[in-house]
């Protein structure tokens, strides 16, 4: 988009380390599938140092929809196929990818969230894609409760989720 191109041009023209630093560029709405659609094109970058940034709460009915399903047994792992598509579209062509927002809202289903985070980050790590959990501080049961870390109390609410994600990236 013009906005993405203006961003790259402005940062590159600012001088200093800005001429070669990596820049993250979102697709339309930062949507993972939109990033792979022919309507999305990366801006031109003389430094050739762009990273595609997407958000991916998938599958939606598990990850975000309060009224969706709360069990994760791996049977819907096909809903994570966008990771393979991001890899073949970008990673395999020398462009980095960051899933800058992902997570599964708390539905009082910790064990299922751990299994989901394991499947999700194992697949992403194997593809060379970094994931950033959307930690909005919410720990109640229901929509938009993605909290993992108590920043004030300096403790981890759900170490099992964090541990499985770190394990998957440390094994790569």
Task: State each model region's role.
Residues 1-68, 84-104, 126-127:
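Active-site region of glycoside hydrolase catalytic domains
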Residues 17, 33, 72, 116, ...:
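A residue-identity detector for tryptophan
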Residues 29-34, 77, 105-114, 139-140:
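Acidic-and-aromatic substrate-binding clefts and catalytic sites of carbohydrate-active enzymes
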């Amino acid at each position: 988009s013009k906005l993405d191109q203006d961003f790259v041009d402005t940062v590159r023209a600012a001088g200093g380390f800005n001429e070669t630093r990596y820049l993250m560029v979102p697709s339309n709405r930062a949507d993972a599938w939109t990033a792979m659609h022919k309507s999305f094109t990366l801006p031109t970058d003389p430094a050739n140092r762009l990273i595609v940034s997407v958000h991916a709460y998938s599958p939606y009915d598990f990850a975000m929809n309060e009224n969706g399903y709360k069990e994760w047994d791996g049977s819907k792992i096909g809903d994570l196929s966008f990771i393979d598509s991001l890899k073949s579209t970008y990673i395999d062509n020398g462009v980095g990818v960051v899933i800058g927002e992902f997570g599964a809202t708390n539905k009082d289903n910790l064990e299922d969230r751990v299994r989901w985070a394991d499947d999700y980050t194992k697949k992403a790590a194997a593809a060379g894609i970094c994931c950033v959990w959307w930690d909005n501080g919410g720990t109640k049961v229901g929509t938009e409760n993605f909290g993992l870390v108590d920043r004030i109390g300096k403790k981890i609410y759900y170490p099992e989720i964090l541990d499985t994600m770190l394990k998957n990236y440390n094994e790569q």
